[in-house]
Amino acid sequence: MATPEEKAKALEAALGQIEKQFGKGAIMKLGETQKLDIEAISTGSLSLDVALGIGGLPMGRIVEIFGPESSGKTTLTLSVIAQAQKAGKTCAFIDAEHALDPIYAAKLGVDVKELLISQPDNGEQALEICDALVRSGAVDVVIVDSVAALTPKAEIEGEMGDTHVGLQARLMSQALRKLTGQIKNSNCLVVFINQIRMKIGVVFGNPETTTGGNALKFYASVRLDIRRVGSIKNGDEVIGNETRVKVVKNKVAPPFRQVDFQILYGEGISRNGELIELGVKHKLVNKSGAWFSYEGEKIGQGKTNAMKWLAEHPEQAAILEQKLRSELLANPEKALLADLEAESESNISEVESDF
């Protein structure tokens, strides 16, 4: 029977052989690094970046964004592209739905001249293009819009009444098996947009499910459930949506965080609105009655006027955002406690209003 010293030597020799054959980092002890240094790309929403725990969507991983129609899925991914391009990264958009509006994308801050776009004929072609872009190592962000539109070639070439049971699910499973290793090696962020469907005959539990089988649920490091929960009105005119995003899966930070933010038509995510709300919540912006003040200076009566002040003073807005980002990402527990306090206060006010 081998002694502990002999076992340690044998293990060291085996690890050395594995690293020699497969390269440095092929195998390591989990406790060697206290914290995984994961590069992230901002989503364009400060509150969502904080909820994700690392400041955005993780590079070198697969992300799924799903939700009902007109919930803001494409808007959120275009916002990710805009933030990535600002950081000097190369982005590609695989438009399987053939529905990308370049004018709207430009309004959200996307440099459409530099954006790579493909409108494939079928699901196999879309996933092959995605694989080629990832393998090149030259593309940093790939968006696939959407999984539901990745129609297998056999289905397109077949008759209307033909049944193709599980064909799309098998296609996704095979593609993800190929992609997942290459995505890590190339440090590319791949985002799949997905739609939801209703499962027939479900009596107990949630009847909603996403398209394309279960493979994407397993391979995705982050899954975001995005919903429209209300409308933003200016008088009688609807000018945007109240949007709620729940982090239903997160392999790089604690999951199940939930955030609300505004998406304004023609503008995208309301950055200044988030700065005001988060600033008040974390006591960087003072609110007294209807008045908001920042660093001792009154910036507006009502949230709309405070947002206008930030829009007119971009330097101050950038400083406030940097303060919030550094404070909340360095202390995620503080952000979580502030969310819980705000939620409990809203619940108390609702109970009081009932009486």
Swiss-Prot record:
Enumerate the Gene Ontology biological process terms: DNA recombination; DNA repair; SOS response
Question: What InterPro entries does the annotation carry?
Answer: AAA+_ATPase, DNA_recomb/repair_RecA, DNA_recomb/repair_RecA_CS, P-loop_NTPase, RecA-like_C, RecA-like_N, RecA_ATP-bd, RecA_C_sf
Gene name as annotated: recA
According to the UniProt entry, its GO molecular function terms are: ATP binding; ATP hydrolysis activity; ATP-dependent DNA damage sensor activity; damaged DNA binding; single-stranded DNA binding
| Residues that coordinate or bind ATP | 67-74
Tell me where in or outside the cell this protein is found: Cytoplasm
> Any one cellular component term from GO for this entry?
cytosol
- Which key words tag this protein in UniProt? ATP-binding, Cytoplasm, DNA damage, DNA recombination, DNA repair, DNA-binding, Nucleotide-binding, SOS response
Pfam families per the UniProt record, alphabetical: RecA, RecA_C
PROSITE patterns in UniProt: RECA_1, RECA_2, RECA_3
Q: What does this protein do?
A: Can catalyze the hydrolysis of ATP in the presence of single-stranded DNA, the ATP-dependent uptake of single-stranded DNA by duplex DNA, and the ATP-dependent hybridization of homologous single-stranded DNAs. It interacts with LexA causing its activation and leading to its autocatalytic cleavage.
Q: What is this protein called?
A: Protein RecA
Family, per the entry? Belongs to the RecA family.
Task: Write the lineage as a comma-separated list.
Answer: Bacteria, Pseudomonadati, Pseudomonadota, Gammaproteobacteria, Pasteurellales
